[in-house]
Design a protein with these regions (language model features):
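S1/OB-fold single-stranded RNA-binding interface
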Residues: 102-106, 115-116, 130-132, 326, ...
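OB-fold/S1-family RNA-binding modules
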Residues: 247, 266, 276-284, 407-492, ...
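Accessory alpha-helical DNA-binding modules that contact the DNA backbone or grooves
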Residues: 34-35, 46, 50-151, 488-630, ...
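Duplex nucleic acid-engaging cores and interfaces of nucleic-acid transaction enzymes
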Residues: 53-56, 63, 67-77, 81-325, ...
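Residue-level signature of catalytic and energy-coupling elements of molecular machines
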Residues: 38, 123, 327, 379, ...
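Short, ordered loop/turn segments at secondary-structure junctions
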Residues: 41-43, 245, 328, 341-342, ...
Length: 719
């Protein structure tokens, strides 16, 4: 079997998916297809894999290719030294991790100047080899004397033996099987410890207090504690170290090296082993383990952030509602923005209901007039500074209205970042930064996805240690999440911003800009075909993006569905078979007729796969389907709650704002989000909070404890 096929077989085995589907995915990716396109429109070839599975295959394929390139390179480098044996070659070829390949290459690596290389240059390698033969006789002194040489700067017998010990120490350190065993043993039985660092006195809020005298088995340390220790170490507040099972490791090395315990060189070898472990192996293994723990913790933090972001982006839109956005503040005033049902800004204003200005009555009348004039149906209040005071003020205004108007507290994380960005300046050149924030808050309620894509995902407030992890890996993961959600939802090509369009499969930032430019020139797109005229939107890009772009009320009714134009011919043949036309998409009559279809026979008749036919039928019956509609709507409120109102045992409804390794933060309508600790999420054992809750979930909680002074609320989801 050729190497490429073996690698694909390996990936299929690793992730537990059929090899033919894995091979199809790799072929499609190498052919320039995007992950969303493959997931949506190539289900027959992939066995209906989702985006995450396809991305996993893509990442594993890249890693294995890189691993194999390194294997070939290492084999070549060792062969060039005429030291490549069949055994070494076989071990390299059978390695499944880069670390294993590097361990095998270590003895052959060109070394910088070390104690061992200096000793070798003095001709002491034969003496080291002699010691390793474990001689029984007492001829070491006599043998060592043969290596005394003024020319080579070996002046005494002791210096000769010392040099030989350095060579032996390095040989022990370079042995791959020893390294592998020591690494595994340290992971299994070692302890990670932390104590106060040089700058511990700067930790005024005692953020790292629990880590000043802390130790835990490496095998049990959880990711968020690794990240906390790393951060504390970086700030010089903590000192972190690994305590290995040193005695067991040295005993293992002695057993492997001193196989004849009665040898006359036993003590010399014990000293060499001690030196090898302490000076060469232990520091390297500690670095490797710390690196591995950090990488795993990074991956976990990135996974949590990605899951939280996905749920945040999938928050349901409040379609067709006119919303008043309020960006709260004290001294500088609360900024107001009315956004109509299409997202168009109808009114910008400012009020000063709070101290130090205290124009509460004037503000009350102004908001009341705005609500009436623009027939506002909902109020969105940002959750930043002065949020609770503004909430109380808005509640008083709403009570004075003749009709029911609800309000929602909107997570405004990142709104100020967006408002000061170049993108916001382009969108609203005539508005001040704070006024743009009010617009963003209103639109976040109307269409969270369309608004949140304008903000750097790292600024949306749902992460955990996001500034401490690999920024490259984090950015890649978050971009993948945004792309996946945008393409799952679909995009109205006549209303979408360039910020949203750039996440559509196949579209780059510049091509997304060209789409908007063309739309402004022609007024609006009448059908999907018109996008073929856009500069730099070639045939491949068109194929990748077009199924995710919708044209509402255009000249081709199928353009408002998620059906790809490549399937229009078969779709129209299906409609003809049913005695229907494209004008009847989404009607009850069409739904009834499709429900009576024999899928397998019809698919054969049309010459398409059954899965593709199923998707076409789904789109014809529910052309406006939005996956976000299946998510609970945000909590609508009419009254305010104070921290002082909370009593132990009180039952409340809240919205999950953030999920972290140790629990979930829930907004229950008071100033501070309450924490549901992982132990209070369920009566059952919970491995991770994400198994129980997600960002945006509406949950019932009970108050477990309130610390008014510290502004802390403990909650429970178990009655």
């Amino acid at each position: 079997m050729e190497t490429s096929a073996l690698l694909k077989q390996q990936i299929a085995k690793e992730i537990g998916l059929p090899q033919k589907h894995v091979e199809s995915v790799i072929h499609l990716l190498e052919d320039g297809n995007t992950v969303p396109f493959i997931a949506r429109y190539r289900k027959e070839q992939t066995g209906s894999m989702d985006e995450v599975q396809i991305q996993t295959i893509s990442e594993r394929w890249q890693y294995i290719q890189h691993l194999n390139q390194r294997k070939e390179e290492v084999i070549r480098l060792i062969a060039e030294q005429d030291k490549l044996t069949d055994d070494v070659k076989r071990k390299i070829e059978q390695s499944v991790k880069l670390q294993e390949v590097e361990d095998l290459y270590r003895p052959y690596k060109q070394k910088r100047k070390t104690k061992a290389t200096v000793a070798k240059s003095k001709g002491l390698e034969p003496l080291a080899d002699y010691i390793l033969t474990l001689p029984q006789d007492d001829r070491l002194a006599e043998t060592a004397d043969q290596y005394i040489s003024e020319e080579k700067e070996v002046f005494t017998r002791e210096e000769a033996i010392e040099g030989a010990k350095h060579i032996i120490a390095e040989q022990i350190s370079d042995e791959p099987s020893f390294r592998k065993w020591i690494r595994q043993e340290t992971f299994k039985k070692g302890i990670i410890k932390s104590g106060a660092g040089k700058s511990a006195d700067t930790d005024e809020k005692n953020v790292y207090e629990m880590y000043y005298e802390y130790e835990e088995p490496i095998a049990k340390v959880v990711p968020h504690r690794v990240l906390a220790m790393n951060r504390g170490e970086k700030e010089d507040i903590l000192k972190v170290s690994i305590e290995p099972p040193a005695d067991q490791i040295k005993a293992y090395l002695e057993k492997q090296i001193i196989k004849n315990r009665s040898t006359s060189v036993k003590e010399i070898l014990q000293t060499a082993i001690e030196d090898s472990y302490k000076r060469l192996i232990q520091p390297a293994i500690e670095r490797e383990i710390r690196k591995e723990l950090s990488e795993k913790a990074d991956e976990q933090a990135i996974h949590i952030f990605s899951e939280n972001l996905r749920k945040l982006l999938l928050q349901p839109p409040m379609k067709g509602k006119t919303v008043l956005g309020v960006d709260p503040a004290f001294r500088t005033g609360c900024k107001l923005a009315v956004s109509d049902e299409t997202g168009k800004v109808m009114k910008i204003d400012v009020i000063y209901p709070h101290a130090p200005v205290n124009k509460t009555k004037e503000a009350h009348e102004k908001v009341k007039a705005i609500l009436e004039q623009h027939q506002v149906e909902m109020v969105a209040i940002g959750n930043g500074t002065a949020s609770r005071e503004t909430e109380q003020f808005i509640v008083n205004v709403l009570k004075d209205m003749p009709r029911n108007i609800y309000y929602v507290i909107v997570n405004e994380a990142g709104a100020s970042v967006y408002s000061a960005s170049e993108l916001a300046r382009e969108e609203f050149p005539e508005l001040q930064v704070e006024e743009r924030s009010a617009v963003s808050i209103a639109r976040r309620l109307q269409d969270p996805l369309a608004e949140l894509v304008k903000i750097d995902p790292k600024s949306v407030g749902v992460g955990q240690y996001q500034h401490d992890v690999s920024q490259k890996r984090l950015n890649e993961s978050l971009r993948f999440v945004v792309e996946t959600v945008v393409n799952q939802v679909g995009v109205n090509v006549n209303t979408a911003s360039a910020a949203l369009l750039q996440y559509v499969a196949g579209l780059s930032k510049s091509v997304a800009g060209n789409v908007v430019k063309k739309r402004e020139e022609i007024g609006k797109f009448s059908n999907r075909k018109e996008l073929k005229d856009i500069p730099r939107l070639g045939a491949k890009t068109y194929e990748q993006c077009i199924g995710f772009l919708r044209v509402q009320e255009g000249t081709e009714p199928l353009d408002r569905t998620g059906i790809h134009p490549e399937s229009y011919k078969e779709t129209k043949a299906l409609l003809k078979k049913l005695g229907l036309s494209t004008e009847q998409i989404g009607t009850a009559e069409l739904k009834d007729k499709i429900n009576q279809l024999a899928l397998s026979e019809t698919a054969q008749e049309l010459g398409i796969g059954e899965i593709t036919l199923k998707d076409i039928c789904e789109q014809l019956t529910r052309p406006e389907r939005d996956p976000r509609d299946e998510v609970p709507k945000p909590l609508l409120k009419t009254d305010v709650l104070q921290l002082e109102d909370l009593k132990e045992g009180m039952e409340l409804q809240g919205t999950v704002r953030n999920v972290v390794d140790f629990g979930a933060f829930v907004d229950i309508g008071v100033k501070q989000d309450g924490l549901v600790h992982i132990s209070k999420l369920s009566n059952q054992f919970v491995k991770h909070p994400l198994d129980v809750v997600s960002v945006g979930d509406i949950v019932t909680v009970w108050v477990d404890g309130v610390d008014v002074q510290k502004g802390r609320v403990s909650l429970s989801m178990v009655k």
